[in-house]
């Protein structure tokens, strides 16, 4: 099984061909437009968002039955729970404080999504929690619930682990491979995209190279093979 998460920086339908060679089973896409479920020949496409051309998509191989969970809470901006046979997936594009522009009764915080979907994630022996968290320990201030260390701790309590950090043994905040380049500048790099897995062992995880992907997006894809 192959899993990808990638913030495509808009116009995903025109960029998908760049992912096709990976032959992935599960693809979590941030900043993508709303498309029909059967838009892609080999994957079903599920979407959530408040802006038609800029939401969160999850693609599942058509060989696997999948659906959006009945628990889907649209007041949690850009978090999408997908149920497949024997596997739960929570796609993430954390809007954080920016979600406030959609009203006072919504949240874009990963901490709130974790709290809401906690039992759903706990009930499944095999799960994926991944995407663009827009978060890193380098930005943590004080002891806020939505600090990345707090999020990581909550995920650890649910038996999730970041595959990148498990494989590389690198400390959070000291990652050698960035996933995001602010304003597409190579010297403004951060690691803010993650794949947390539960009940699965990964063979490897790769992050796209700046030179290969920067023309397409300010984020690099994470590709994990199970």
Feature-to-residue mapping (PLM):
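Catalytic phosphate/metal-binding cores of nucleic-acid and nucleotide-processing enzymes, i.e., regions
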Residues: 10, 17, 22, 33-34, ...
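Metal-dependent phosphoesterases centered on the DNase I-like endonuclease/exonuclease/phosphatase
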Residues: 26, 109-192
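Active-site-proximal loop/helix segment associated with metal-binding centers of metalloenzymes
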Residues: 89-107, 153, 158
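Conserved beta strand-loop-helix elements of the APE1-like EEP
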Residues: 51-67, 84, 175, 181-203, ...
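Active-site metal-binding loops of divalent metal-dependent hydrolases
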Residues: 8, 32, 94, 133, ...
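Structured beta-strand-rich core segments of catalytic domains in phosphoester-bond hydrolases
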Residues: 31-99
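Short catalytic/ligand-binding loop motif for oxyanion handling, primarily in non-cytosolic enzymes
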Residues: 12-14, 35-38, 97-100, 136-140, ...
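N-terminal, active-site-proximal structural segment of metallo-dependent hydrolase catalytic domains
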Residues: 1-41, 50-56
């Amino acid at each position: 099984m192959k899993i990808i998460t990638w913030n495509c920086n808009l116009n995903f339908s025109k960029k998908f061909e760049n992912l096709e060679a990976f032959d992935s089973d599960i693809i979590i896409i941030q900043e993508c437009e709303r498309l029909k479920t059967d838009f892609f020949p080999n994957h079903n496409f599920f979407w959530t968002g408040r802006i038609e051309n800029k939401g969160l998509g999850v693609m599942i191989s058509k060989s696997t039955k999948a659906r959006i969970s009945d628990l889907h809470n649209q007041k949690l901006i850009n978090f999408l729970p997908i149920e497949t046979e024997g596997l739960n997936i929570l796609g993430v594009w954390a809007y954080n404080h920016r979600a406030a522009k959609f009203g006072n009764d919504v949240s874009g915080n990963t901490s709130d999504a974790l709290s809401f979907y906690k039992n759903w994630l706990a009930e499944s022996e095999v799960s994926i929690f991944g995407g663009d968290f827009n978060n890193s320990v380098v930005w943590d201030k004080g002891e806020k619930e939505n600090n990345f260390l707090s999020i990581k701790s909550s995920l650890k309590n649910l038996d999730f682990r970041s595959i990148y950090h498990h494989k590389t043994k690198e400390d959070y905040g000291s990652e050698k491979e960035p996933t995001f380049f602010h304003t597409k500048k190579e010297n403004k790099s951060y690691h803010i995209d993650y794949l947390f897995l539960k009940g699965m062992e990964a063979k490897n995880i790769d992050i796209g190279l700046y030179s290969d992907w920067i023309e397409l997006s300010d984020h690099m894809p994470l590709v994990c093979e199970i």
